[in-house]
Amino acid sequence: MADMILPVAMQQGDTEQAYRAPEVYLMRLPDSRSAKKKAPYIIHRVIPLETEQQPGSEERTVVSVRSIFCCYNPDEQEGDLALLTMMERFRVELLKVRKVGGTGTDGKHRYQFTLVLSPGHKLESVPYDEETKPYYAGEMITNWKLPTVQQTEDIKLWR
């Protein structure tokens, strides 16, 4: 999404409109009072973690991630379209890749998290209806399978 350039709200002292790609934050904005100054942005927030194990099958841990999208545009139609475009481009990229991860200690890329799409775990996308113009926001809920934790030994947690 680095190539998606959107307008930034003009601040006191600005003489011309600035543009940039959405910034990405984990869990929350660094300064929640500056939410309007930070637009456009995406915040990824981890919400409930759920581990289950069906008899005779592997343990499965799924985490939900709420991605909150925000953009600015002085034109109402352009603002709504910019938000929908930002959310749709993100959704399409997720569906193309379906796996995310990091770099291991050996320098190789590791796919640690797999997108889960099933009747109980849908990819949901909702633009907010509130009248917040010239700011536009929405959210997407995704579910991710975490790596299985291999039990290596029996330990007593409470002695």
Language-model segments: residues:
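Small/polar-rich, solvent-exposed N-terminal microdomains that initiate assembly or binding
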Residues: 1-55, 158-159
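Short acidic, gly/pro-rich beta-turn/loop elements at beta-sheet edges
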Residues: 52-54, 75-77, 150-154
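Extracellular/virion structural assembly segments
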Residues: 56-62, 71-98
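Oligomerization/assembly interface segments of phage tail-like spikes and tubes
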Residues: 58-76, 133-148
